[in-house]
Amino acid sequence: MLPSAVAAHAGAYWDVVASSSLLNFPAAPGFGNLGKSFLIENLLRAGGAPPLGLPPPQHHGSAAALGAGAQVRSLPASPVPLKLCPAAEPVSPGGAPYGTRWAFQVLSPSADGARLPGRAPGDPDCAFQPPAPAPSKPFFLSAPPFYSACCGGSCRRPASPTAFAREESVLPLLTQESTSKVRRGILRRAVFSEDQRKALEKMFQKQKYISKTDRKKLAINLGLKESQVKIWFQNRRMKWRNSKEKEVLSNRCLQEVVLQEDPLSRSALGFPSPCASLWEVSQQHPSPGWRENSPEPSERLIQGSPGAEALPPEAKSLQGALYLCSEEDARDKNALTGTV
């Protein structure tokens, strides 16, 4: 058999398998005959009858084939490994090599090591075994060619948009549940009537801290809950403390302002008057008796007194101090110094 006939026979066989048996979809233009569509053998084969022993290739869609009563050949239910391998480059009679042709080959666990014609005998990746018997379950007819042929049909189609719930429909449910849980713990503010408020205020003036029994009685009389009465007393005590603190602070500020403006008002407010300085006292009493009765300097006292050498240092320091005293105190002091 000529190489051209062998190549034509192999090309027709793979076109039939890829188009009708494997995918049942019309092959894409130039996919199965990549690089060979311009050859004379392909043009003659496309215009004339197919070789003997092979059915004519079906290029119409699956709907037309099913409508005409043609039986679709299905693949095994188990994943069938597919392998992509480059075919050998057979030499044409003119000496020009054919282009490299890629094809999906179906491999099945069979001991038959037959090889396709037109393939290199030393290529281990291009071995062909007859496929297993077809089961009754058809192949994915509605699947695209890429997802059906890739990885032996194990690749899944992308999920439709309606397969999963939309986020917009899920988020409102979550937000409603979370907000409802949060709102359950929040207590609504009780609105008291004028009579209830007056009764509560009257009880607060009697006692700032209400007992449990009194609180229960007051709640029953006013038609309130014990928790409402308890919360009202807590808020009222806090308000009372804040008012007391503000009052004390305002009084202190007022006193400080008054003292800064008028120092003589200290006696009116009950504050003790500050002690007068020595200079003010000396200016208020300029009588000569004070000056005469004032002690002499420490040097003269130490030199004039006979027992000055035996005085301790504390007495010496006291003698050197300035004493402002009356005439009677000066006489008593002179008598004491004479006895010493």
Swiss-Prot record:
Highest taxon, organism lineage:
Eukaryota
| CC per GO annotation | nucleus
Q: Which GO terms describe its biological process?
A: epidermal growth factor receptor signaling pathway; G2/M transition of mitotic cell cycle; gene expression; neural precursor cell proliferation; regulation of transcription by RNA polymerase II
Q: What Pfam families would the database entry show?
A: Homeodomain (PF00046)
- Main localization (coarse): nucleus
Read off the CDD domains from this record. homeodomain (cd00086)
Map out region (Disordered) in residue numbers: 283-313
| Gene3D superfamilies, alphabetized | Homeodomain-like
Q: Which residues bind DNA?
A: 185-244
Tell me yes or no: is Cell membrane among this UniProt entry's keywords.
Answer: no
Alphabetically ordered keywords of this record = DNA-binding, Homeobox, Nucleus
Single GO molecular-function term?
DNA binding
User: Localized where?
Assistant: Nucleus
The entry assigns this protein to a family as follows: Belongs to the H2.0 homeobox family.
UniProt protein name: Homeobox protein DBX2
To which species is this protein native? Bos taurus (Bovine)
Query: In the UniProt record, what gene is named as encoding this protein?
Result: DBX2
